Amino acid sequence: IESTVDHGIKSMEEDPKRSMRRLCDLGRQFSKSRCQDYLFGIIQELLENEDSSYYDLVANALKNTDHGTIRDFGVAFGYTSWTYGARMLRSFEKRTGHAAPLTLMLRFQPDLAGGLSISDIDNIIQQGTAIGIFSYFIREVGGSSDSYEIINLFRKYPDCGFAYFRSSGRLTAAQIQ
């Protein structure tokens, strides 16, 4: 999977618009659920506009982001979460009769009494991955004094995809590495 994604990233650098449309077409062709088909259909509609800001977004990401990071993130979301994790979740739902989400959205509030701490988020991720949840959107609330802590937690789960929204400021180069 990784080598295929690496090839796709290289193709995107050469012709981002064509590559994005092609990847979306392939995604829709191989989608295995109504939800995946619907999602790829929406993306196809957005990409029909030659002036879509999504083309600029992807070109910017390719220019300014390590390609290994893009690959790892794409595999975590696109394969581990949406394919492998979705299969695990369907099995969990059949076995227990309880529905579970494909993605969890969490509020990281370490400085707030009763807010989610690193330990809380770690426990949630452990429980989530056990049933098939491999993608997490984490929003920092209240300005954490130490972003290194949460980033190290992300590194503990290399099969997961994380989108981290800080309350203010940017990550430092050291935090990104």
Describe the predicted segments one by one.
Residues 75-82, 86, 117-124, 146-151, ...:
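Well-ordered, non-membrane alpha-helical segments in soluble/globular domains
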